[in-house]
């Protein structure tokens, strides 16, 4: 009996993706602060783009989601970086993690403005999270010869 897909929807947007993002923003159990950060970021997106922020969020996560990832395998004393395909849920989780990591590294005053600008950049296929996905795909392409070691 799998309990994995038991993600609840958030109270305002009624969306599971928003709740997944809030749970990744969460630090030290302060969920209300995480919600406030994300909702402020969504308001910034609505103010700057005049689009539905949920649409921008979905588009950003879709753009950042990787198809393959690199795993390290040890075969006969040597280590190989083996490209492996990943499921959509794992890819989505990676995309959320990369988006938040890129927004935390971004210069700016508060995390809400940094994450809103990173989400808008990712929706337009630019930004550090997109760079991370392209780097992972490039690495997988370079190590395609070791794909048989899966």
Swiss-Prot record:
- Indicate the transmembrane segments per the record: none
Give any GO molecular function from the UniProt entry.
structural constituent of ribosome
Q: Which InterPro entries match?
A: Ribosomal_uS7, Ribosomal_uS7_bac/org-type, Ribosomal_uS7_CS, Ribosomal_uS7_dom, Ribosomal_uS7_dom_sf
Name where it's found. Answer: Plastid, Chloroplast
SUPFAM superfamilies for the chain: Ribosomal protein S7
The text of the family note is: Belongs to the universal ribosomal protein uS7 family.
> Assembly and partners?
Part of the 30S ribosomal subunit.
Per the entry, what this protein does is:
One of the primary rRNA binding proteins, it binds directly to 16S rRNA where it nucleates assembly of the head domain of the 30S subunit.
Q: What is this protein called?
A: Small ribosomal subunit protein uS7c
Gene (name only):
rps7
